Amino acid sequence: WSPVYHFYVDDKTLVFNPPSLEEVLNKFPSTHPRILLERKDWDNIIERNKDNPEAKSYITKANKCFQHPLKHLEEEIDTTQVVKLTNIVQQRSALIREGRKIVDREEANIEAMVRAYLLTKDARYAQEAFKRLSEIISWKSSKYFAGDFNLSTILSMSTSVYDGCYDILTTEEKSLLLNTIQENGHKFYEEYVNHLENRIADNHVWQMTFRILNM
């Protein structure tokens, strides 16, 4: 949380020249967390945001999640309308929509858990974030779980939990998240590599590949 910054682009503005991949990788912090905040600033950020309304809203949302444990997908998803459809394409579309409702909801819940942990260092939030995410990861073979957006959300959540909750995760838990990141990241890379040149207007390239893989 910082003040609003503003700047002007005029004739004197330097032309942006993107650095090489090697330069970017060399400047990555070697410690975690490093996405939402850097480890060296962690305690200072906690202190500065003790009374921040936005910070408090994440903690409040995270606390509410404890009251609503995540069930398995078969118990969470609403299929009452899906079973009435006879067209397989309509059924699949309906399942994707219903599945996304659950995954999108949990993405917001897990984001709140990760941020609450970073704002407090209370291990309960990190543990609950991983617990919910590991349940969602187990859904990938379910007939009720479909669509690239669900997979890309899992990729994003896995990255956030791995980085944000790194200190709390066990070796086995880190391995699960890294394998999930590698599996889904590889899938999207293979699907979209060199695709940008063919269809620059394909938003999935930006939403699923560049944004998340750059995390």
List each model region and its residues.
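Extracellular and select intracellular beta-sandwich modules with Ser/Thr-enriched
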Residues: 1-4
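Low-complexity, Pro/Ser/Thr- and charge-rich linker/hinge segments at domain boundaries
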Residues: 7-31
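Extended, solvent-exposed functional surface patches
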Residues: 24-26, 43, 53, 59, ...
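Mature N-terminal segment immediately following signal peptide/propeptide cleavage
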Residues: 28-49, 55
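Aromatic-lined, polymer-binding surfaces characteristic
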Residues: 49, 58, 67-70, 75, ...
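Active-site nucleophile-His-acid catalytic modules used for acyl/amide transfer and hydrolysis
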Residues: 63
